[in-house]
Amino acid sequence: MELIKEIKNLKRNKNAIILGHNYMEYGVQLVSDFTGDSYDLAVKAMKTNADIIVFAGVYFMAEQAAALNPDKKVLSPDPNAGCSLSDSLDVDTLKKYKEMYPNAPVVLYINTSIYTKALADYIVTSSTAIKVVKSLDADTIIFGPDANLANYVERKTGKRLVKVPPNGRCIVHANYTRQLVELARKKYPNAILMAHPESPLEILEASDFVGSTNQMIKFAKESPYKEFIVATELGMINALKLQVPEKTFYPLVTTEAYACARCPYMAMITLEKIKRSLEEEIYEVKVPKDIAERAKEAFERTMRLLNN
């Protein structure tokens, strides 16, 4: 495909890399130098020698990369690519909860803005949340913005999580129901169900495996099973097919609900936008120095805890 060749040439000429989230469309994953979940890509961003980082993901991910790499030029192919979770929590709301629970550590899911991250003690992903919460010497923890993930972490750790906001949800995972699971199991009787922790608790309880996008890939590679129903954003099927081509994957959707399984924000990142952003070096992500330093501090504190 000519467009893919052009993007690869631009990367080479500009010493640029593309970081692609696992939810990206197939073509975007093909041009990405690294694919992974939010945490994985944040770490990759810190280790790169490239001059330019194009973040093929939603805006909060590009913000994080910019905060962690103040000397790099970080580009977002579409700065309007938001996130329902990130949009659900603002700085003023988080400050109020911190005042209400002054002794509670603040653990924020990575799907939030850099400005709220700057108020956090720890920044987690779905793959690290349980370990971080379990490690903290506190029985009450402020956790946001994903209430579904909070419910799952509470179940696994026995700790009280004060959800901020109380009803933060991913618009894709919020659509999953037990009825969808039952229909999928009937349609694909030889498949096992993998679910993302952003899903409602009833879906997680009905699943054979619960994990982040990277954990799903690892599980699919190592599992003796050949067929999988995947309860997460539709683009994940692309990542699984690319990395585990010998196995078969089915999205947890009906024909009628197919569009609802695609995150409208992730879908905004296209090859055409990546090419334009890189070619013209537009939509550079800028984070105020003090905000970036505080967010980076929380991220590095989390990494130290995870590496212990």
Swiss-Prot record:
Subcellular location, record wording: Cytoplasm
Keyword field contains Iron-sulfur: yes
Cofactor note: Binds 1 [4Fe-4S] cluster per subunit.
Domain of life: Archaea
Binding positions ([4Fe-4S] cluster): 83, 170, 263
Binding-site residues, iminosuccinate: 21, 38, 109-111, 126, 196-198, 213
Pathway the protein contributes to: Cofactor biosynthesis; NAD(+) biosynthesis; quinolinate from iminoaspartate: step 1/1
Gene Ontology molecular function, alphabetical: 4 iron, 4 sulfur cluster binding; metal ion binding; quinolinate synthetase A activity
Record GO biological process: 'de novo' NAD biosynthetic process from L-aspartate
Database matches in InterPro entries: NadA, NadA_sf, Quinolinate_synth_type2
Alphabetical keyword list: 4Fe-4S, Cytoplasm, Iron, Iron-sulfur, Metal-binding, Pyridine nucleotide biosynthesis, Transferase
Pfam families: NadA (PF02445)
Cofactor(s) recorded in Swiss-Prot or TrEMBL: [4Fe-4S] cluster
Enzyme Commission identifier(s): 2.5.1.72
UniProt cross-references to HAMAP family, sorted A to Z: NadA_type2 (MF_00568)
Family designation: Belongs to the quinolinate synthase family. Type 2 subfamily.
Protein name as it appears in the record: Quinolinate synthase
